[in-house]
């Protein structure tokens, strides 16, 4: 790979020209903000720690800023784009600016939330400037259906980045924080200013990195069965976050006393609130619940 010329990345002028050619105006409905700074794109790819054998999913490639840099590095890039004009243009942009890597691009014209396991073959990484309005649902959906993903590096709104990487007890700790940590170790990986986007958003963005648990060293089984047992507990615990766990989980367990019994068996104080529990606590509670149901 090293003996091939690098892709020609897009700058502000090229982004505007492409948008004008396609009669594309970034829409709030689709959460579109196009990155037009090559240095930011290079930084994102570097922070993702990609290897030459990686198969990367990119959601919302837009005009191709990040796509071109990913093609430079990865073995294969599957770009998922919902906008028909952008989906039609992306292969043309790649052919023009990174023709030597064109065979590495796989394009799916689809809503990322409807992507199915059979749509993408063994992806190993997710690197994307996620559409702001669906960033968390898309992230969790792809982690759920593609257990082969080992690394995630996504750009999201700063407040979403803070939420995803928050620890128990933090005021922004909540459902996204706990569910993301079911799959791996989550951390903030940098901040992105407004001026690298067109149009410039009103708030800053942040990078979030997830190092997905190694299948041979998972702290709990990262399986569909475990997810289905754990995630409803998380949802119930945070549905009314000011309630104690005993009260918040009473509906899930059928009564307050039943919830308290399960919590105490799991070694969790029933008067705590959900925001004090980490993912390991919820997994332990799910296991207690499963054991009670089998008894």
Curated annotation (Swiss-Prot):
Single Gene Ontology MF annotation: 16S rRNA (adenine(1518)-N(6)/adenine(1519)-N(6))-dimethyltransferase activity
Main location: cytoplasm
Family, as annotated: Belongs to the class I-like SAM-binding methyltransferase superfamily. rRNA adenine N(6)-methyltransferase family. RsmA subfamily.
Summary of the function given for this chain in its UniProt record: Specifically dimethylates two adjacent adenosines (A1518 and A1519) in the loop of a conserved hairpin near the 3'-end of 16S rRNA in the 30S particle. May play a critical role in biogenesis of 30S subunits.
Gene name for this UniProt entry: rsmA
Domain of life: Bacteria
Native organism taxonomy: Bacteria, Bacillati, Actinomycetota, Actinomycetes, Mycobacteriales
PANTHER family: DIMETHYLADENOSINE TRANSFERASE, DIMETHYLADENOSINE TRANSFERASE-RELATED
Binding site for S-adenosyl-L-methionine: 33, 35, 60, 81, 111, 129
Top EC class, one word: transferase
A Pfam family this chain is assigned to: RrnaAD
Compartments where found: Cytoplasm
Membrane spanning stretches: none
Keywords on record: Cytoplasm, Methyltransferase, RNA-binding, rRNA processing, S-adenosyl-L-methionine, Transferase
GO CC annotations, alphabetized: cytosol
Known EC number: 2.1.1.182
Full protein name: Ribosomal RNA small subunit methyltransferase A
Reactions performed catalytically: adenosine(1518)/adenosine(1519) in 16S rRNA + 4 S-adenosyl-L-methionine = N(6)-dimethyladenosine(1518)/N(6)-dimethyladenosine(1519) in 16S rRNA + 4 S-adenosyl-L-homocysteine + 4 H(+)
């Amino acid at each position: 790979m090293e003996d091939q010329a690098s892709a020609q990345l897009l700058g502000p002028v090229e982004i505007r020209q492409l948008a004008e050619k396609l009669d594309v105006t970034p829409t709030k409905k689709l959460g579109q903000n196009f990155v037009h700074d090559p240095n930011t794109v290079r930084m994102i790819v570097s922070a993702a720690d990609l290897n030459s054998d990686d198969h990367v999913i990119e959601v919302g490639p837009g005009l191709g800023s990040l796509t071109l840099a990913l093609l430079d590095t990865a073995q294969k890039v599957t770009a998922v784009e919902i906008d028909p004009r952008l989906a039609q243009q992306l292969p043309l942009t790649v052919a023009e600016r990174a023709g030597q890597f064109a065979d590495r691009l796989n394009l799916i014209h689809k809503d990322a939330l409807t992507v199915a396991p059979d749509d993408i073959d063994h992806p190993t990484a997710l690197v994307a400037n996620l559409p702001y309005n669906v960033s968390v649902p898309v992230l969790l959906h792809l982690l759920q259906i593609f257990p082969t993903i080992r690394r995630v590096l996504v750009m999201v709104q700063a407040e979403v980045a803070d939420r995803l990487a928050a620890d128990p007890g933090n005021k922004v700790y909540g459902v996204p924080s706990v569910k993301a940590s079911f799959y791996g170790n989550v951390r903030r990986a940098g901040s992105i200013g407004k001026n690298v986007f067109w149009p410039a958003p009103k708030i800053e963005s942040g990078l979030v990195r997830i190092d997905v648990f190694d299948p041979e060293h998972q702290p709990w089984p990262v399986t569909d069965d475990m997810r289905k047992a754990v995630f409803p507990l998380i949802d119930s615990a945070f549905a009314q976050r000011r309630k104690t766990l005993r009260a918040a989980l009473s509906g899930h367990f059928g009564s307050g006393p039943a919830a308290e019994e399960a919590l105490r068996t799991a070694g969790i104080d029933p008067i705590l609130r959900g925001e004090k529990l980490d993912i390991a606590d919820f997994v332990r509670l799910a296991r207690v619940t499963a054991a009670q149901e089998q008894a």
